[in-house]
Amino acid sequence: MKKQFLSTLLAFSLAGAVNAEVVVGVTVSSTGPAAAIGIQSHNAIKLWPDTLGGEAARYIVLDDATDVSKAVRNVRKLTSEDGIDLLVGPNITAGALAILDVLVETKTPMISLVGSGSVVQPVNEGGREWAYKMSQNDNLMAQALVEDMQKRGFKTIGYIGYADAYGDSWWREFSA
């Protein structure tokens, strides 16, 4: 997965090879309710390479505090003030969905850290043509879970999920 991410990052960096530096903006939830995920993402960024495609790489990391409006403000700042070539994050579905319009306005590609397929599907709708993600979509995970439960003879299951964009996405998959 790391190689795939770095290859994608490299591909985006080569598109702007005129620049002497590849600027990658990152918005993650280092604080707030999703900090358990965001802190891990923030720490992983420290391991990223100093160069991408032979060009110097600079990473600008902002905390969106698990706040959708702050994620949007972060992305606006990163695109307008910092002139990023690529965005990584957010790490919550609601934040990733909220910034899609900014991606279209600024023509900035995003590699999202969320699990929900709603950030990238349907493709070419609502800014999703600028969105990519690292993990498999919910439907693949849900399909594997359902197949396993069927093999084990489960007839009835219960669903407990969060009342947010990610929980809604899972509910749709299990309801299909």
What are these language model-derived features?
Residues V23, A36-N43, T51-P122:
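Beta-alpha junction/loop-to-helix N-cap segments that form part of ligand/metal-binding clefts
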Residues T27-S30, S116:
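Active-site pre-Tyr helix/loop in NAD(P)-dependent dehydrogenases
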Residues G32-N43, A165-R172:
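Glycine- and acidic-residue-enriched helix-capping/strand-helix junction motifs
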Residues L47-T51, K77, E147-R152:
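A generic secondary-structure signal
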